[in-house]
């Protein structure tokens, strides 16, 4: 291999080893964009100036007007080239930014995958199954204990609750009977009943009997009301 070939090969290998980072390349592209934007603004101003000169010398000095138009055309050509260059630089910068973003995403995903792998290395599926079974069994036991506490407690005293209730009803009935038998009846008036009025002439005897029966029922109702009031 010739010395010249070795020289170019060494230059390529050195450039490959010293490849710029994405951040450095992006910074340089942004610097170029700013420089080209300033150049673009300068050319636009020069174009407007030459156009004004051409209009100024149009009728008086055609030679000066033509020179101004020529300069204007050159500046417009340069401006067109700068526009194309800026478009290319913007495209390259956007592509590099996307590549840098994808690289960062891939790197972080790989980092997360390694962390997840390290976590899973300490896990055993059999141990997890055993743990879940233990948790389920303990939950069932806790549920049974809760149900046992919530159930009615039955004391082993040998007494039947139905018999006790029946005996209680008998005692209540006896107390009620005692009250009824010891109840004092209202005093009966000792005076003799008033004499019945003499039967008027023309009034039938059935009418007198009906009035007497109504009077007795009224007295009985009064006695019953007094008895009920005393009992309550």
From Swiss-Prot:
Entry membrane topology: Peripheral membrane protein
UniProt GO BP: autophagosome maturation; autophagy; late endosome to lysosome transport; late endosome to vacuole transport via multivesicular body sorting pathway; midbody abscission; mitotic cytokinesis checkpoint signaling; mitotic metaphase chromosome alignment; multivesicular body sorting pathway
Compartment list: Cytoplasm, Cytosol; Late endosome membrane; Midbody, Midbody ring
Transmembrane segments: none
Cystine residue pairs: none
Residue segments, region Intramolecular interaction with C-terminus: 1-153
Name of the featured protein: Charged multivesicular body protein 4c
Gene name of the encoded protein: Chmp4c
